[in-house]
Amino acid sequence: TETMLVAGAVKTMTAESAQRAALGAGAIVMDVLASNDGRLPHQRIERIRGLRPDMILLSGGTDGGTVTHVVDLAESIAAANPRPRLGQSYRLPVIYAGNRDAREHVQEALGENTTLFITENLRPTLEQENLGPARRKIQDLFMEHVMAQAPGYPRLMEWASEDIMPTPAAVGRLIEQVAAKENINCLGVDIGGATTDVFSVFDGVFNRTVSANLGMSYSVSNVLAECGAD
């Protein structure tokens, strides 16, 4: 499962939308940064530098709105000069899914320390969420850039005759297809080795939440601590 840092201009709006996009794409969200999260600039930079995520999702601003806050976040990312968790020979991917008027400013602020990918604004208006393009870009980059650095993955690609999907994306698609085919609301739980994922489709809207520290192998000690030996 890919690990991500997400950032948005406003904690209760674009940052939450970015988190939903990342979770829906199958990621573990390591932290959520926002311009109004109470952290000082140097604290934000230290946090970004210390996390070593697989990629970063940056959002902020409705289309045509202010560009200041999201550019400030981009400058913090650039100052942190983050390194990816896997692989030393490529730059960390950053997906920008914010105010379209800020694209050039964000690109200039990030500079050459990261590889920037631009997709549609995930919050084009205050009332509208548009999570699909960001989710798809996260999944594509995970397979193309992150998994390509994983030991043995190139050999696996040679063996496989079909496209390889991350488990959360595959389970999420299954839940969506069941809900659509049966015209019902659907809830599914996937208990994995390191994480437990809950998928839902209600009124046609797909969501995924993840507990990143509860699972049946790598994280089983956390389950024991939560439940007790009895």
PLM features: residue spans?
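Nucleotide/phosphate-binding catalytic cleft detector across ATP-hydrolyzing
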Residues: 1-185
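Glycine-rich phosphate-binding loop of actin/hexokinase-like ATP-binding domains
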Residues: 176-230
